[in-house]
Amino acid sequence: MDFRVSREAFLRVLTHVSSIVDSRSTIPILSNIYLKCENNQIEIRSTDMDISIREFVSCDSTKNGEATVNSRILTDIIRKTKKNSIVKLKLEGNRLIINSDNSVFELNALSADEFPKFVPLDPTNSFDLTIPQMKRLFNKTKFAISAEETRYYLNGIYFHTVSNGSKTALRCVATDGHRLAKTELDLSNNVNISGIILPRKFILQLDRILGDFEGKVKMICTDTQVSLEADNFIIISKLIDGTFPDYEKVIPVSNDKLLQVEAESFFNAIDRVSTVNQDKTPTVKLQFENNSIKIMATSTDSNKGDEEVAASYAAEALEILFNSKYILDLQDVIEGETMILELLNQSSPVIVKDPKDATSLYILMPMRI
């Protein structure tokens, strides 16, 4: 294997591929990335046995070949080389020689035969989305993914299709048991996804990587795996093997008290008042009455803060306690200037809606007063 490659193009792909590599893996080959040079193209792969990534980059090759080398070391070397330079890589026996300007590096290379194979998914159940559409679906819901490993079936986004009139919609739902986020997108083709759970790690990897691509992505779903393809990039992930709860049952249908408030003012007030509460579970008490919201916070060491925000509210007075962090997490998903809260009583779930986005809905569970 002998090739020359642009430092920028090579580093871009290495950054993508190395993002899933576990440097602490007890299986040495999994700390490596796979390199294959063939016909002026480099194939670069990595896997942690749950997620696999493959990407191609153009090069000027004089000899084909393949090998695996330590992912972190190779990526760091290329990152520290001179910008806009040409990097030369050559395999000599079990050593990968790297040349850049006046620098020369030698890395130990393991046989490519030991590296796990990459098997693309059957594209029978596939559909195309634009990258902004894909990012929007994930960004609207990922904040509600549970990090509690004992409830592993909540450690991802529930992905399924629903009938939306004459169209099919792709719906994403996430919940940690204290809040829920739901959004959907109409599809142009009649794909059928009965219900799969995309792992949190897969979602976060895509969030880091998709910003480097433009145009469309192809998503393929099977009963056990999911893949996403964009340009010369493909990522495949195992699905979470579990049953997502019936989320429809926790969406209230009788919340009859409506409140509308200017979103930025509301979030800023929550942020200011909650500053006094540095407890592990920061709380704020909201009093709804007479076209206003009174926001109050008290910490275990007797710090206090309160602020009143104007709102449109004509129902009976109500007092509800919330985790302030859960409210503030909504700041990144509310697009409109105002937001709507649908209330029932101090112990029932609260529905949060964005007048500018009819496709999304959020649920907040109150805390005990």
Q: Over which residues does each language-model region extend?
A:
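Structural preference for solvent-exposed beta-strand-turn elements
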Residues: 1-369
